[in-house]
Amino acid sequence: MDAVIDTSVIIEIFRGNKDTLYQICDYNCKITSITVFELYCGNLKENEMIMIDSLPKLNFDDKSSKIAGNIFKKLKKEGKIPSVKDLLIASIFY
């Protein structure tokens, strides 16, 4: 089964959290291009970069950008302003 893992999950794995690793070990894990950006903003070790680069990626594309824009407008009308990074990640799966 496929699973998309978020930045916080990867950071927990990098910190040595074995419980987190065991929870995802039976899945075919993927990350988004937005998650790659978030991780590369930090101070990654070489082995962490290799792990990130080895995971399959789901990319933010033209379709995702339109979806994100429409979701943002809808939420803004409702008085809610979402986290832009979370909105971009969510739009990849919509």
Swiss-Prot record:
Function summary = Toxic component of a type II toxin-antitoxin (TA) system. An RNase. Its cognate antitoxin is VapB3.
Q: What is this protein called?
A: Ribonuclease VapC3
Q: Which cofactor does it need?
A: Mg(2+)
Task: Kindly indicate where the leader peptide sits in this chain.
Answer: none
Where are its TM segments located?
Answer: none
- Select a single GO molecular function from the record's annotations and give it: RNA nuclease activity
> Could you say which enzyme class this protein belongs to?
hydrolase
Q: Which residues bind Mg(2+)?
A: 6
